[in-house]
């Protein structure tokens, strides 16, 4: 997985904060 996120991806993650934290844990 590419750790770098596009602007659109960042916006989507900011909307679903709980999901974003889970995704970031998976990326680590």
UniProtKB/Swiss-Prot annotation:
Belongs to the 14-3-3 family. InterPro entries: 14-3-3_dom_sf. It comes from Pseudotsuga menziesii (Douglas-fir). It comes from the Eukaryota. This is 14-3-3-like protein 4.
């Amino acid at each position: 997985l590419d750790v770098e996120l596009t602007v659109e991806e960042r916006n989507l993650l900011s909307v679903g904060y709980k999901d974003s934290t889970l995704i970031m844990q998976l990326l680590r």
